[in-house]
Amino acid sequence: MAYPFQLGFQDAASPIMEELLHFHDHTLMIVFLISSLVLYIITLMLTTKLTHTSTMDAQEVETVWTILPAIILILIALPSLRILYMMDEVNNPSLTVKTMGHQWYWSYEYTDYEDLSFDSYMIPTSDLKPGELRLLEVDNRVVLPMEMTIRMLVSSEDVLHSWAVPSLGLKTDAIPGRLNQTTLMSTRPGLFYGQCSEICGSNHSFMPIVLELVPLEVFEKWSVSML
């Protein structure tokens, strides 16, 4: 989860988020190299009084600065497309959870079970227990098994919402009348916090998301207790 004065991303807890972090570093390095080269050329032009007349109209230079950016864009696009396909791929999910956005709470339905659904509201600040996080705790956490592929179906009952959990690399729009899907898989147990990431009204800031990833045995006991 995030902490005060954090400068980087949250710690990755899923293969998708790890890939996104690597892609971020890859792209940032390319941007840094390009910026350094441009700054060097500008500095060189400002500090020298010499002018090479043949470079003012040289087809070779124009060819280079056309082909080189195209190659750089390809180096950025290829890993980006790979990650996009990974995020959209859904192969034999072990569990399907339907998520509905409301003003201003989330509701969840475990579609593989006959009657397992609940609403998830933010706990008011006045009701928080010691150690709980302000504006992030909910009365009903989404309990899921770790190290298993889970399909999330996301939609909305009223206005646009967005279901996002940064440490898992998840952000899916909840659109009324449309069912979007995404997959998640956590490589470790723990609590993972998120929030609605689409302005949806006056209480938009009070729609937290809490996922509790646990071993399969613990999840089975929890699901039995909820039925």
UniProtKB/Swiss-Prot annotation:
The record's free-text note on cofactor binding: Binds a dinuclear copper A center per subunit.
All ranges on the Mitochondrial intermembrane side of the membrane: 1-14, 88-227
Residue intervals on the Mitochondrial matrix side: 46-59
CDD domains: CcO_II_C
Catalysis: reaction(s): 4 Fe(II)-[cytochrome c] + O2 + 8 H(+)(in) = 4 Fe(III)-[cytochrome c] + 2 H2O + 4 H(+)(out)
Cofactor(s) essential for the protein: Cu cation
One GO CC term, this protein: mitochondrial inner membrane
EC number: 7.1.1.9
Top-level taxon: Eukaryota
InterPro entries, sorted: CcO_II, CcO_II-like_C, CcO_II_C, Copper_CuA, Cupredoxin, Cyt_c_oxidase_su2, Cyt_c_oxidase_su2_TM_dom, Cyt_c_oxidase_su2_TM_sf
Tagged with keyword Methyltransferase: no
Keywords: Copper, Electron transport, Magnesium, Membrane, Metal-binding, Mitochondrion, Mitochondrion inner membrane, Respiratory chain, Translocase, Transmembrane, Transmembrane helix, Transport
Binding site for Mg(2+): E198
GO molecular function: copper ion binding; cytochrome-c oxidase activity
Entries under PROSITE patterns matching the protein: COX2, COX2_CUA, COX2_TM
Record-listed Cu cation A1 binding positions: H161, C196, C200, M207
Binding positions (Cu cation A2): C196, E198, C200, H204
Enzyme class: translocase
Transmembrane segments: 15-45, 60-87
Localization annotation: Mitochondrion inner membrane
Membrane topology label: Multi-pass membrane protein
Record's subunit section: Component of the cytochrome c oxidase (complex IV, CIV), a multisubunit enzyme composed of 14 subunits. The complex is composed of a catalytic core of 3 subunits MT-CO1, MT-CO2 and MT-CO3, encoded in the mitochondrial DNA, and 11 supernumerary subunits COX4I, COX5A, COX5B, COX6A, COX6B, COX6C, COX7A, COX7B, COX7C, COX8 and NDUFA4, which are encoded in the nuclear genome.
UniProt family annotation: Belongs to the cytochrome c oxidase subunit 2 family.
Protein name: Cytochrome c oxidase subunit 2
Organism: Balaenoptera physalus
